[in-house]
Amino acid sequence: MKIVIDLMGADHGVLPIIEGVSRALENKSFGAVLVGDKDKATPFISKELASKVEMIHTQDYIKMEEAATEAIKRKESSIYLGMDILKNGADALISAGHSGATMGLATLRLGRIKGVERPAICTLMPSVGKRPSVLLDAGANTDCKPEYLIDFALMGYEYAKSVLGYDSPKVGLLSNGEEDIKGNMLVKETHKMLKAYDFFYGNVEGSDIFKGLVDVVVCDGFMGNVVLKTTEGVASAIGSIFKDEIKSCLKSKIGALMLKNAFDTLRQKTDYAEYGGAPLLGVNKSVIISHGKSNARAIECAIYQAISTVKSQVCLRITKAFESLKPSASTHQSDQQDA
């Protein structure tokens, strides 16, 4: 299995990415192709690691403040070269760089799965249950039609079932109330259409995401990204409050030591790094979009996630799902093209 890792554009430079790759190679067998500035990367690559990875040199990359469309023009940028390697034989790609550039190039270079109108970012959310919930779209499509959300539901269902191993996953539609009559026009129309699918649970509220009421939560990319960023902010704030209170007195420090295992579990469930990255579902190969602030652990977990998506053949499973479950899938044409 060959995995392409974009070294460029992340908030903390190349070091956390290289460390993440190194750790993953200690635990899993895969071919790693690193794409980025060799001069910046070489000081952090040991002789042992150098023997295990392939390095593709380029100094160009799409900066966060640049438009995503720049990626189409910049054929020597790290994400363009990486996507080209993926298209021509690699199995998966991971990038913590410009997410818009990654999404745009994935759609143009890899093409959409037949029947998929819009690819979606799929992310895992912490839950009080033993397994996380799946949320999509987490930011790829801010303006949506009901048909897009149907696609998201089908893709999320297949991801939960094939990659995460959830048995008969239930899909909920994010709304401002659980009643069928609640929601804006988009939610109401989508609700009517989702009733045709056995996996549909009904409307769910924001709080239900973390209760494990359903396995997959579907919404437009604007709402999904707000939910995601709010969750990250709340988790960070709670962590800071705990740290301040623990440091406040000796009794708190002693209590914290006694509850160390519980705190470790809480941290693991709420730390984005443990979830790796967010798969871009709906394109013809496995693409994982990692957080710009990713540390070594996040990159390591993103690689494990990529391996799981490839082994589970999620792209093929989504293709078959659209052929069998989506009535209108046969009327759509694949967006595969040579850019």
From Swiss-Prot:
UniProt entry tagged with the keyword Lipid metabolism: yes
Pfam families, sorted: FA_synthesis
One annotated GO biological process: phospholipid biosynthetic process
MF term (GO), any: phosphate:acyl-[acyl carrier protein] acyltransferase activity
First-level EC class: transferase
Keyword terms of this UniProt record: Cytoplasm, Lipid biosynthesis, Lipid metabolism, Phospholipid biosynthesis, Phospholipid metabolism, Transferase
Reactions that this protein is recorded to catalyse: a fatty acyl-[ACP] + phosphate = an acyl phosphate + holo-[ACP]
Coiled-coil stretches noted in the UniProt entry, renumbered to this chain: none
Pathway stated in the Swiss-Prot or TrEMBL entry: Lipid metabolism; phospholipid metabolism
Enzyme Commission identifier(s): 2.3.1.274
Family: Belongs to the PlsX family.
Function of the molecule: Catalyzes the reversible formation of acyl-phosphate (acyl-PO(4)) from acyl-[acyl-carrier-protein] (acyl-ACP). This enzyme utilizes acyl-ACP as fatty acyl donor, but not acyl-CoA.
Protein name: Phosphate acyltransferase
Organism listed in the record: Helicobacter acinonychis (strain Sheeba)
Lineage: Bacteria, Pseudomonadati, Campylobacterota, Epsilonproteobacteria, Campylobacterales
This protein's encoding gene: plsX
